[in-house]
Structure formats: C-alpha cells, structure tokens
Design a protein with these regions (language model features):
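Hydrophobic alpha-helical transmembrane bundles of multi-pass membrane proteins
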Residues: 2-188
Length: 188
C-alpha cells in the first residue's frame, strides 16, 4: 500500500491539476460507494487471513484483527470528522473502513486485538489529517490514494515493527533491530 500510495502521489504531481469544473464534483452514487467498501471489507478477509495459507490460529487472528481494525477506523473517521466540525457522512465511513483495512494489513496476524484497535485508531487520525492536508494543497489526488493508502501503509509498516512479538515493544536489542528493518523497508 505504501508503494502504490507513493506512486499515486508521484503520478498526481506529474500530471498536474484537473480542470476546475471536475475538481469540485460530488460523488455520483453513494450507495455504490458503500457497496464497494463492503465488498472490499469482505474480500480483505481472504487477503489477510488467507495469506497464512493455513486454517490455524494465525488466520483466525488475522481475520479478527481485520474486522476489528476496519470497524474501529470507520468509527474513528466519523468521530474525528465531528470533532473537526464536519458533518459525518457515508463517504467518510467508507473511507475510514478502507483506511482501517490498509492500516492493519502488515500486522494482521501478528498483533493482539487491542493492538489492532490502537493501530487503526492512530493511523485513521493520521490519514484523516493527511486527506485534509491534501485537499488544501496543490496536489490533485482525486481518490486520495496517497493520504489513505500511502500514509496508512507507511505508518502501518512502522507500527508493525513496534507491536509484533519480538518488535520494539519487547524492549530488547533484537526488537530494536526488527524495528529498524521496518523503517528501512519504508524508506526503500
């Protein structure tokens, strides 16, 4: 997700802004956006839980963390929009859902449910701020791919290095080395 988000940012910068008439266009069909988000959420279970290639505890943990993180992110996005004086919306709920899926993907099978709630909560706030920043910048990323996928993927990878078993949170030198590998992966 980090690489696709950064590629989208590079593409948006390279292509420049759209014509003014298409920039302020409202979403055409909100029910289809919600249907798409629901189908993404459903498909993501196979993506995260199926990545273990076994029907074991890791797959169950990935499944549970995927659902928990997405639900947490959806509610966090709506709540943060309300805190910032914006009206809660179905579009915001759909974006929050996708941000939660992106945020938990690197660590879905390797963190506890409580950690997945924390990860998705923090990353959702960061992505919400990134979407706000993008909307006030000269970058024309029509689908907010960088603020959601790029930012969520980058911080999801960093937080994975902190929270996985044997990661930075373990307090050992080996955990510090694991965390540095995650930082290096983000930079590269």
């Amino acid at each position: 997700h980090a690489s696709s988000g950064v590629a989208a940012l590079a593409g948006a910068i390279f292509l420049g802004r759209r014509k003014k008439s298409t920039i302020d266009a409202e979403p055409a069909n909100i029910p289809f956006v919600l249907l798409g988000a629901a189908l993404l959420w459903l498909g993501w279970f196979g993506f995260n839980a199926g990545s273990s290639l076994h029907a074991d505890g890791t797959a169950v943990k990935a499944f549970l963390n995927t659902n928990t993180a997405s639900a947490t992110a959806m509610m966090t996005w709506i709540f943060f929009d309300c805190l910032r004086g914006r009206k809660p919306s179905a579009m915001g709920a759909a974006v929050g859902c996708v941000v939660g899926l992106v945020a938990i993907t690197p660590s879905a099978g390797y963190v506890t449910v409580g950690q997945s709630i924390f990860i998705s909560f923090v990353i959702t706030i960061i992505c919400n701020i990134a979407v706000y920043w993008r909307s006030h910048s000269r970058i024309d990323d029509a689908l907010d791919v960088f603020p959601t996928h790029g930012t969520g993927g980058i911080f999801g990878t960093v937080l994975t290095g902190i929270f996985i078993q044997g990661g930075l949170i373990s307090g050992t030198w080996a955990g510090f080395i694991v965390f540095l590998y995650h930082i290096l992966a983000v930079v590269i």
